[in-house]
């Protein structure tokens, strides 16, 4: 089983706030999305869809590795850019055949920080 499927199959018992329409959750790792106030260990609620709107934050599988990134599309150039919300991370740029290496799982609809 791939790392990605392990991430998504583990059901997290999390109280979603009223009105959150989410199909699954994942736990954020690292500091790549802190500009969107998503911190290491936060629970991210994902609505399953294979496309998101330009500029939305999505759960993306890149070569079997699950990650959260802001998605920018340039359809006229057949180009997709995945951006971290932290300037120390480079943009990930995909075009042409490279697009086959990534798969959008869904849109991030809500976040919940662990308050211990």
Regions found by a protein language model. Name each.
Residues 1-8:
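Short, small-residue-biased leader/transition segments that mark boundaries at the very start
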Residues 9-116:
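Acidic/glycine-rich C-terminal interaction modules and beta/coil loop segments
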């Amino acid at each position: 089983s791939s790392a990605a499927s392990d991430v998504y199959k583990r059901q997290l018992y999390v109280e979603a706030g009223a009105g959150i329409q989410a199909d699954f959750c994942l736990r954020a790792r690292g500091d790549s999305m802190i500009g969107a106030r998503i911190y290491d260990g936060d629970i991210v609620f994902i609505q399953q869809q294979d496309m998101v709107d330009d500029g939305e934050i999505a759960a993306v599988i890149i070569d079997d590795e699950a990650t959260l990134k802001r998605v920018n599309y340039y359809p006229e150039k057949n180009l997709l850019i995945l951006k971290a919300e932290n300037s120390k991370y480079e943009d990930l740029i995909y075009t042409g055949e490279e697009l086959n290496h990534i798969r959008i799982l869904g849109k991030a609809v809500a976040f919940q920080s662990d308050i211990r």
